[in-house]
Amino acid sequence: MRDVYEVLKEKGITLPQPPAKGGVYTPVQELGEKFLYCSGCGPDLGNGNTVVGKLGKDLTVEDGQKAAYNCVLNLLANLNEKTGDLNRIKRFVKVLAFVNSADDFGMQPQVVNGGSNLIAGPVSYTHLTLPTI
């Protein structure tokens, strides 16, 4: 597997600072020696780069994909802070995504792909996840 940081740099992707915690929880918890459990991350990158609204009403699929992408960037920032090296991450087992959408909106998987593609594409984790949407 290629160096994650080299791939991010080639793609022009900069990890944000880990997001501020919104409550009493641990962003990344170690379970044994080889498993990390991550709390959810929202789309706010802490620099005004965020997405707010309801898909199918206020937001387009592309807006939702940007939100999902931002969520994964925040997740990677938390993992980087916890592990000290994203190259130690070998696989993502599951992605749980909550998509704020109108009742008649049916493109939640395409929205979530905005984040999943960051894991499977530029970051190049070879084993894809089991998504729950």
Feature-to-residue mapping (PLM):
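Basic, amphipathic N-terminal segments that precede the first structured/catalytic domain
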Residues: 1-19
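RNase H-like nuclease fold core
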Residues: 27-63
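Short, well-ordered beta-strand segments in beta-rich or mixed alpha/beta enzyme
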Residues: 36-40, 93-102
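Short, well-ordered amphipathic alpha-helical segments that serve as non-catalytic structural scaffolds
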Residues: 67-82, 115-118
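Phosphate/pyrophosphate-binding loops at sites that engage ATP/ADP/AMP, CoA/4′-phosphopantetheine
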Residues: 82-89
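Short, hydrophobic/π-rich interface segment
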Residues: 102-125
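Conserved small/polar residues in nucleotide/adenosyl-binding loops
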Residues: 126-132
